[in-house]
């Protein structure tokens, strides 16, 4: 049954150009071709990368974060409250004021105490700054190594600089051993991201990230299986050349190296704009749509590949809109603000709560208000702003 299902799934009419058979892509006379079963090796590679990541973050990234001065904000523990906890988990993490008043009366607390409980409870679920730093550090190292390795493998290939050449003699293109290992590592890495997805930092674009990881795995696995290695390698290298810049920018941001972060972010925005909004659609997608079927008609695999590329491009446009928002803030404020995709740590001081105005006293202050203390202790999150740095996210 499984054998017949496999035969049905990998029918030549689905995935290969017309009049091309799998038999033509069998290894012969010293020629080696890509085969679908090769991608199965990516699963153990993914598990190895997960193990390497755990060791790297524990013994390299975490000590590096301490050396660079990354400190987690102090979070005060909350008192257990079954009523508020049940509402927090099942209903809403940020109740409206009317609901907050009702919850306060049910628990015998004041409105301020209830607001403080929810604020501290939200902070409790937010990832620590050191966790964000370690995650960014791991991705920076992998993307940088992948970019350097991919560049050394593809630099002398003519089809890298002219993607239309990717379709010469397709699909009868032999497999380069170094390209195979690079492809395998890339596929294993994105599979490892799917494995660690429940434990990684969840940003506001979490759903888009999940879609991206699945599209990336689909593109890498499919392009290898049907011998679309050349155009697939171009896509991978285009992404690696900007991804390591983004992760490096995050590292500097978490360490409060403001000038370095600003400069690196501008460089990242320029590289992202050219590679993903100019080169990718005008060269990669264009040649995949038109040049790939010059010598054959369209088929199911052709449409499947184009759909994946278009989905990737839609994500590129979405993320560039976020980049533009951050650049707009940079041009108006003169420095980078926090990553708009991230959750910001809420201040833990009770002085930050909104207080209703009371009767005015003779000195012009409202009853119940407090004088701001300028030299008193503050939370670490607030201290990050007094020295000119932005709050890291």
UniProtKB/Swiss-Prot annotation:
Its EC number is 2.3.1.-, 2.3.1.24. Residues 341-393 are annotated as: Disordered. Pathway: Lipid metabolism; sphingolipid metabolism. SUPFAM superfamilies: Homeodomain-like (SSF46689). PROSITE patterns: TLC. Pfam families: Homeodomain, TRAM_LAG1_CLN8. Its main location: endoplasmic reticulum. It catalyses: sphinganine + octadecanoyl-CoA = N-(octadecanoyl)-sphinganine + CoA + H(+); eicosanoyl-CoA + sphinganine = N-eicosanoylsphinganine + CoA + H(+); docosanoyl-CoA + sphinganine = N-docosanoylsphinganine + CoA + H(+); tetracosanoyl-CoA + sphinganine = N-tetracosanoylsphinganine + CoA + H(+). Ubiquitously expressed, with highest levels in skin. The keyword Transmembrane applies. GO terms for cellular component: endoplasmic reticulum; endoplasmic reticulum membrane. Residues 325-393 are cytoplasmic. Residues 345-355 have a biased composition (Acidic residues). It is found in: Endoplasmic reticulum membrane. A motif (Last loop motif) lies at residues 291-301. It comes from the Eukaryota. Phosphorylated at the C-terminus by CK2. GO terms for biological process: ceramide biosynthetic process; sphingolipid biosynthetic process. Residues 1-31 are lumenal. Residues 131-332 form the TLC domain. The modification Phosphoserine is found at residues 342, 349-350. It is a multi-pass membrane protein. Residues 67-128 are annotated as: Homeobox-like. Ceramide synthase that catalyzes formation of ceramide from sphinganine and acyl-CoA substrates, with high selectivity toward long and very-long chains (C18:0-C22:0) as acyl donor. This is Ceramide synthase 4. It comes from Mus musculus. The gene is Cers4.
């Amino acid at each position: 049954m499984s054998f017949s299902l496999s035969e049905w799934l990998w029918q030549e009419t689905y995935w290969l150009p017309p009049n091309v058979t799998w038999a033509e892509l069998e290894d012969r006379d010293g020629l080696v071709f890509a085969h679908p079963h090769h991608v199965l090796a990516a699963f153990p590679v993914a598990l190895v990368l997960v193990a390497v990541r755990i060791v790297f973050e524990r013994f390299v990234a975490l000590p590096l974060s301490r050396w660079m001065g990354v400190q987690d904000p102090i979070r005060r523990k909350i008192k257990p409250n079954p009523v508020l906890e049940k509402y927090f988990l099942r209903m809403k993490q940020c109740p409206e004021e009317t609901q907050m008043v009702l919850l306060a009366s049910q628990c015998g607390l004041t409105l301020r105490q209830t607001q403080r409980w929810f604020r501290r409870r939200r902070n409790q679920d937010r990832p620590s700054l050191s966790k964000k730093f370690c995650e960014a550090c791991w991705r920076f190292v992998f993307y940088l190594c992948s970019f350097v390795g991919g560049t050394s493998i593809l630099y002398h290939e003519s089809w890298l600089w002219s993607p239309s050449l990717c379709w010469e003699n397709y699909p009868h293109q032999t497999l380069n051993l170094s390209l195979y290992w690079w492809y395998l590592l890339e596929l294993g890495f994105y599979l490892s991201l799917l494995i660690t997805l429940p434990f990684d930092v969840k940003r506001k674009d979490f759903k888009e990230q999940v879609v991206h990881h699945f599209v990336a795995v689909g593109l890498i696995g499919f392009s290898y299986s049907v011998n679309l290695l050349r155009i697939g390698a171009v896509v991978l290298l285009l992404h690696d050349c900007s991804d390591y810049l983004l992760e490096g920018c995050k590292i500097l941001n978490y360490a409060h190296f403001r000038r370095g972060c600003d400069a690196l972010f501008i460089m990242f925005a320029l590289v992202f704009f050219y590679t993903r909004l100019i080169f990718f659609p005008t060269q990669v997608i264009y040649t995949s749509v038109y040049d790939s079927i010059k010598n054959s008609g369209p088929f199911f695999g052709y449409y499947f590949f184009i759909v994946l590329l278009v989905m990737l491009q839609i994500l590129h446009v979405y993320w560039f809109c976020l980049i533009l928002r951050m650049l707009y803030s940079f041009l108006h404020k003169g420095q980078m603000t926090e990553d708009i995709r991230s959750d910001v740590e809420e201040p833990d001081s009770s002085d930050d709560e909104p207080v209703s105005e009371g009767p005015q006293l003779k000195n012009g202050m409202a009853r119940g208000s407090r004088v701001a203390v300028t030299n008193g202790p503050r939370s670490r999150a607030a201290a990050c702003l007094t020295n000119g740095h932005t709050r890291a996210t």
